[in-house]
């Protein structure tokens, strides 16, 4: 994912919203969008701001680290990664709270809700300004985080949970296309492919070309 960052730069920090846990705090969809999600995003952004302030103003990293001293990295090309995981769990919980059966990756209303959540996160990030992220217009970069070893029942980023993928690969690719645009600093998906593909690598290349 660091390939999405500026050459000669990097990320001060990566923090993440665990969207499923935020949804568990909500009484309903309205409460999620008006209270729970904004509260957690604000707390995380302030936490990231303080981490960045310390790194730049107090730690001495950019004055003492050999990478900076030898010109390999430059502070003014750094930004930060505003991460998220658990979109699938979040959407499914909110759908249940609204008395609806649709699930993320299989239902248009559920997928539309996922896009609505991403629009809210994107709007918050675009409104939040950090003085030391000037390389990216003063804003963090959104990042669909793949998870950590301790995660339980948390689906990475905006992925459809493993085992719940659509039967047709094209349907999964279309689903991905609705979310990938939000994440300049990285996102990823897992696609089940039949083992016989080893005999026909051109098939995979065609899928990649079609996906792009």
Q: Which residues make up each language-model segment?
A:
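Contiguous, well-ordered alpha-helical segments that form the cores/surfaces of helical PPI scaffolds
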Residues: 80-93
